[in-house]
Amino acid sequence: MKKLRVAACMLMLALAGCDNNDNAPTAVKKDAPSEVTKAASSENASSAKLSVPERQKLAQQSAGKVLTLLDLSEVQLDGAATLVLTFSIPLDPDQDFSRVIHVVDKKSGKVDGAWELSDNLKELRLRHLEPKRDLIVTIGKEVKALNNATFSKDYEKTITTRDIQPSVGFASRGSLLPGKVVEGLPVMALNVNNVDVNFFRVKPESLPAFISQWEYRNSLANWQSDKLLQMADLVYTGRFDLNPARNTREKLLLPLGDIKPLQQAGVYLAVMNQAGRYDYSNPATLFTLSDIGVSAHRYHNRLDIFTQSLENGAAQQGIEVSLLNEKGQTLTQATSDAQGHVQLENDKNAALLLARKDGQTTLLDLKLPALDLAEFNIAGAPGYSKQFFMFGPRDLYRPGETVILNGLLRDADGKALPNQPIKLDVIKPDGQVLRSVVSQPENGLYHFTWPLDSNAATGMWHIRANTGDNQYRMWDFHVEDFMPERMALNLTGEKTPLTPKDEVKFSVVGYYLYGAPANGNTLQGQLFLRPLREAVSALPGFEFGDIAAENLSRTLDEVQLTLDDKGRGEVSTESQWKETHSPLQVIFQGSLLESGGRPVTRRAEQAIWPADALPGIRPQFASKSVYDYRTDSTVKQPIVDEGSNAAFDIVYSDAQGVKKAVSGLQVRLIRERRDYYWNWSEDEGWQSQFDQKDLIENEQTLDLKADETGKVSFPVEWGAYRLEVKAPNEAVSSVRFWAGYSWQDNSDGSGAVRPDRVTLKLDKASYRPGDTIKLHIAAPTAGKGYAMVESSEGPLWWQEIDVRAQGLDLTIPVDKTWNRHDLYLSTLVVRPGDKSRSATPKRAVGVLHLPLGDENRRLDLALETPAKMRPNQPLTVKIKASTKNGEKPKQVNVLVSAVDSGVLNITDYVTPDPWQAFFGQKRYGADIYDIYGQVIEGQGRLAALRFGGDGDELKRGGKPPVNHVNIVVQQALPVTLNEQGEGSVTLPIGDFNGELRVMAQAWTADDFGSNESKVIVAAPVIAELNMPRFMASGDTSRLTLDITNLTDKPQKLNVALTASGLLELVSDSPAAVELAPGVRTTLFIPVRALPGYGDGEIQATISGLALPGETVADQHKQWKIGVRPAFPAQTVNYGTALQPGETWAIPADGLQNFSPVTLEGQLLLSGKPPLNIARYIKELKAYPYGCLEQTASGLFPSLYTNAAQLQALGIKGDSDEKRRASVDIGISRLLQMQRDNGGFALWDKNGDEEYWLTAYVMDFLVRAGEQGYSVPTDAINRGNERLLRYLQDPGMMSIPYADNLKASKFAVQSYAALVLARQQKAPLGALREIWEHRADAASGLPLLQLGVALKTMGDATRGEEAIALALKTPRNSDERIWLGDYGSSLRDNALMLSLLEENKLLPDEQYTLLNTLSQQAFGERWLSTQESNALFLAARTIQDLPGKWQAQTSFSAEQLTGEKAQNSNLNSDQLVTLQVSNSGDQPLWLRMDASGYPQSAPLPANNVLQIERHILGTDGKSKSLDSLRSGDLVLVWLQVKASNSVPDALVVDLLPAGLELENQNLANGSASLEQSGGEVQNLLNQMQQASIKHIEFRDDRFVAAVAVDEYQPVTLVYLARAVTPGTYQVPQPMVESMYVPQWRATGAAEDLLIVRP
């Protein structure tokens, strides 16, 4: 406390203005008056000095146009309030404006001043307005335009000028003040004459902590100063005279050069306040005084630093460079050589870099973003010294398929390496490692297969490879419930942008992949108009067009088109945007329908560019997603700090990105003010509405040279702004941004500064070792710096350079050791500072890939395949390899695969190319940091601060149908070509019609190649059935059978159809079909799905095919359709205790609503109160490995059960070997969630610490070790240390949302004590201290855990007292009380019973607790994983306890008897007649669980949760399900509410069979949800605000895991398409909590879905 008081006193004394000097220094004014300001001194001044031809041109352009006043506003110009009148056409500059335009102050009379006319002759300006004045502005009708037009009448308007509050602040947030080139520290002042400034030097040992807490803010609040100023010493206090011009915001410099206390090396904090004022918060800035420029290139293992003089750009020798961690400890240091270069080891803990010499200090924060190099072509795969090329035959799989991965290991130059094992990790979409294996090569090829579970989570999966260098390589693949496409669709527009007057046309080509045109097929689609903000790909980040323009985003038209006999068509739309001045794009989203309604969807875009050139704007600060209170939506837009300067890059560019020269760009800063009010209407009640007022805050003119990027900056306060740039051709571009909104930021957006660009040009397309590179370097300005040749491992060559205005030509010899392909040339050129011109140092960067690819090592691979073949035949691929020089390569290995193009087209899969992988351009491998973005500029432009992350939940709602999808994928074994470079591979092709892409990869020890070819697979007559993905019992559907004659002869065919399984034909099948050559016909087949769960099958026999010279057998085809019940599965539970002689029978109506064929059950009979251990194991086994708690809970049964025990319980389990392997995997997963401090987090080690779960997981790991599993000692030790910390320092625990923090901490401490005591590692003193806080316990469980720990460690007395108290302390039954221990009354009782039995304590109390627990468990229909595991642990300890019983049952003629509980699995017939009689002389406990599918929709129900479903069209309007046509898109809107916070809600919306999801994870092949109407966009905005953890698009359901806050509705939206005509039952939507399963809801039932053709 004493230190805090001292710091506070020091700050107060400092703020009192105690000057160390007798005379206050005077601030230096550095802003030279602008030409406009000078002109203001004349009576009627004009800055418009135009030549006669220029005047004539302007007059001609405005000929015949009317003169009107467009705007009359107060604007800030050169820091002063200015009245600006904007006219529609140029004014005559020769008239006396003071005679025709008058400004009168209502209080003081006429306002004196001179009118200034802008260069474009359209704006009149009157400067230096007084604040808070009512001004009457009168414009006489005599005002004359250049074309001689005049006002029709006099104009008068009253405006009130803004209030001006005295203000002062630092004008730069840069941290480096180059004293040799900048005279002082810049400040911005308005009507403040004197300031007191206090300078603090940050203590060296506190520097990293200070920087971390400072966060580069621009003010220091009093409450922040207590903590921050403890880390700094006050070294100087001074008063400075500013004396800015009255009512004018001026930039001035505080002279620091003669202040001796600031000449000591260090980092300083300046805190400023207006003299004589004491504010809650004061302007502050952090800076160092230094001439040392620093740039750093950060690689994987090293850090290369270059130091230069800010004064002259020369390399600086003898600079001491140090790396510091966040604790201020020096990690490593070195001194720069003659070239200014320092090499340091890259330490992941490095937070700061300090460069010091002769009292100067430069600070580089390595925690800030690296330099943004988006404008450079530096993309590619990462470069490594060991290259591991991973590839497969495809990157899209369905759950249940087997993933295939191949790999080649080479060095950086593609040369073979010795064989070595490589570790592969299979990673789920949630980031969890599912399996780790070690792969060994065979003949140089690594091969790995991974069978996906049938319920594998959908999304993006990864296989991660580690070659031993701990640099991970990733191979990504999709897992989705997709259907292979049968057709191809090509949509094309014009490649170059159109003008706004042009008609937009898209050509359409559709064909079946087996070769026939899609003639007669329907094309449905939509045409959308959208603004094209980032319109120029060559200028990333620049936005073009007026963001305030209205009606630029809308749906243009719906498309319905039938393709011609060649499968072609055209879609066109006339321009409805001829007057636009902003870039636009027309998007055509087209869906080509099969005869059964299933689509193939593609998109095409047509750009529209409205002028020769347009202004482009790029903010120099980050865009972030924030909640916009004005629109009640989440928006992404740039965010800048309140009270700072908002800086922007400006270009004037054509559509190709060529920067044009321009004079007179008008740049305006506009504040968007909204005045809200309430409005009442009969239809909508009270609605919040607003009036928007655009206030012009500031304005300046900008001239740009060709190929120049201009920069502007403006001071901003809190609020919403728009920056607007208007070109001489009237084109306007604008961007919106927020100031002062970062506190509501909910993203990790970071503003990485883009540097100016150095242009690098090479003299050759590629080089070889021994060549000489001729490099031309052209910098924006002359300067010094360095040029480098870099690899991903570090620099290979560098040289100091001096670039003149005309550029520099440099020769670089290519060293023969540069045998790698991740090389880049990079340059940094620094413009030296110049005090005389107030020019601060400025940096430009160049990066260019250095190609060293050797075409001589490319294998030419020829594939000979048939152009066409029939199904059910082998495909032989002949291969021939050769080299560029014609020689026959030796020992060529080839891997051949053939894959259905209908799979590859969905993801645009590119045939893997090993040559490109090893020799192609790699990603630039360095992160560049430098201080040039932090230099404080003397003339006031703000320098930017920064240079430049399965599961059976799906079965909730019932098992999914089995979907039979024929996916053709064949990968042959590798073959070695013969001495002539030739070989062949034969692949079996089954019953498939379509297109195969044959892909081949070839390699030798040094050379590589690849190729592909297409093969059409088609029968002479093709029969393809179009059917829904599944059906529900009771559905009727109209299947379509397409029969295509691909022969050149007419065919008379007989088609016989039958159905079996769970399908029946509704009408007789067709008999005869006649087809001309090339003709396709469609047969309609009505079917009905029967009750049950399983498959239905359609069989077709096609006979009569006549082929010349062939005897053709009948063609037999079968298609299976998965059938499931229409409504979610339900469970009923019965239980009783029968006394001797009593009989129990199932109630007559108990199973009445169940479909008999789906009904199954389990009967448990026991001589003691039963716990259904089989149920608990099943539920835990069914639960996915997910978060920390789920993973641990799911593993416990595998510790204590084996395959024989599971079989005895009626559970299908894995072998003991697989069971032990799954535990090993689970342990690995748990350890991935262990934090560095030994605790555990919920999802990964970077998450927040979970205190109770840390004890829970440590309990499991200790038990696993006891059961013989390998648990790393280090992990156990670190976990134990963390548990010990819980015992000894409970104050360090922060448990969010805990309703009883003391009880939560007591629960954590007690469990930690038990786990440590189990290992004899719990300090008895700590246990006794916890016992003293026993009154904090909110449940008996922690008291029992503490009691067992006390007894174990030797304090039997306190232990027994704790155990006795535990049995008298029930848990509060209110589930809404959160204690942070994942508990419930049921869970606690179960763990207490388990503890008592494990430790052989109180057998009578055990029996009482068992009886209570049995009743509790029986009453719970749904259990959390915590409860299931606790019940398992309790049941496993008591299942062997004796309890004789005897029973007679209706399903067994023999009498049943036993001493242990017995489970019997029952079918539907046994269940509906079930009777049980107690034929023994002891009580008999009975539990019966039956589950099945209801025959009718369940009634809506809700407990805590509530769910509603709405069906909309893509226009956002309500749509009925009984009036859809095949191909129609519908939007499904789910709204979920909760009366308590539910962080783990799982939403399952089962689909009716006639609808199919448009999978947004497969954007290339699905209709886009984003391309919808305005109402739909509002719903999408609401959805963006939801905390959605996971979304899945399945064959028969939409699934989302989402957090639902109390009384805050969650919106979920998905897109579906009506496909197969028919009548379908509509299931209800469901939602439930995964941890409190009784919190659940079922939505209202819907009418039938009717899909018409």
Curated annotation (Swiss-Prot):
Keyword terms, alphabetized: Cell inner membrane, Cell membrane, Coiled coil, Lipoprotein, Membrane, Palmitate, Protease inhibitor, Signal, Thioester bond
Residues forming coiled coils: 1559-1589
Signal sequence coordinates: 1-17
Gene3D superfamilies attached to this UniProt entry: 1.50.10.20, 2.60.40.1930
Record-linked InterPro entries: A2M_bMG2, A2M_N_BRD, A2MG_CUB, A2MG_MG1, A2MG_proteobact, Alpha-macroglob_thiol-ester_cl, Alpha-macroglobulin_TED, Alpha_2_Macroglob_MG3
Keyword DNA damage: no
Lipidation (S-diacylglycerol cysteine): 18
PROSITE patterns documented for this protein: PROKAR_LIPOPROTEIN (PS51257)
Lipid-modified sites (N-palmitoyl cysteine): 18
Family of the protein in this entry: Belongs to the protease inhibitor I39 (alpha-2-macroglobulin) family. Bacterial alpha-2-macroglobulin subfamily.
Annotated domain remarks: Cleavage causes major structural rearrangement of more than half the 13-domain structure from a native to a compact induced form.
Entry function: Protects the bacterial cell from host peptidases. Acts by a 'trapping' mechanism. Cleavage of the bait-region domain by host peptidases leads to a global conformational change, which results in entrapment of the host peptidase and activation of the thioester bond that covalently binds the attacking host peptidase. Trapped peptidases are still active except against very large substrates. May protect the entire periplam, including the lipoproteins anchored to the periplasmic side of the outer membrane, against intruding endopeptidases.
Protein name, UniProt field: Alpha-2-macroglobulin
Origin species: Escherichia coli (strain K12)
UniProt lineage: Bacteria, Pseudomonadati, Pseudomonadota, Gammaproteobacteria, Enterobacterales
